[in-house]
Amino acid sequence: MSLVTLCHLTKVYGIIGDLSTLKCIFSDKKLLIAKNCLLCYSLGMAEYIRARSDEHKEERLSQIKEATAELFASCPYSEITLTTIAEKLGWSRANLYKYVTTKEEIFLEISAEKMAAYYNSLLSAFPDGNNFTPDVITEVWAGIVNANQDYMRYVSYLNPVIETNVTVERLAVFKKKYYDLAYAFRDRLAQMLGTTQDAAYKIQLDVLFYASSNAVCCYKNPLVQEALKQINITPPPMDFYKDMKDFLKMRLAWKL
């Protein structure tokens, strides 16, 4: 009888700690090994039980988000699956399924965190009642967008991909967070520019969509770079910060 079989027996019949009934099968040495195996199993079960607490569940979810974000920093979205995420964590897919059912759920959670960081930076940089000029607004806002390029990559996948494969309950929670933050900045921007709330919201949306498009520009794709090289096409140089400043300057001048 193997140790694996023994562990299976202990799991099925609850033989934990007392192996007297199995002494006829194992030598003293094997019995000691078996006891160690059972100890590891019982400790593992205790760890599994703790993982079901709210605190430990949050810890596991943080590990999942961190692993997924690391993968997305170096891999195309299409190559990231629950399998690759589980492998990154050193988990089985079954363990991962205890916390999430789709990779989009993970990306939605990461997007929510990065979204909060972006809008909170804007609200902090532009305090209520400020008298910043359009030039100052342009420079500061472009700097914040530049510092949040990673979030812009997530934005580019939100509407067409991420939001289409999560539950309506999860999506509602995410949308509530978005509108709370976006409307807070909309109101602040409307005061700063002396324009309507609708116009201010349209401006911040235009900036968000332009930035998200630039953040995933095809020229950054190694495959596209190689294809252009083969046909002797040199793509224009890209400067994300400068491009955002130019766009913001133009967009703020046209406030309608």
Predicted regions and their residues:
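Basic, helix-initiating cap at the start of DNA-binding domains
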Residues: 19, 30-75, 83-84, 129
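All-alpha amphipathic helical-bundle segments outside canonical DNA-binding/catalytic cores
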Residues: 191-208
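Helix-turn-helix
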Residues: 63, 71, 78-105, 109
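Amphipathic alpha-helical packing segments from all-alpha helical-bundle domains
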Residues: 165-193
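Short, basic, alpha-helical segments at the C-terminal edge of helix-turn-helix-like DNA-binding modules
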Residues: 112-119
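Hydrophobic alpha-helical connector segments
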Residues: 109, 124-151, 203-207
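Amphipathic alpha-helical segments used for helix-helix packing
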Residues: 147-169, 222-226
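C-terminal peripheral helix-coil segments that are non-catalytic and often amphipathic
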Residues: 10, 15, 23-45, 183-187, ...
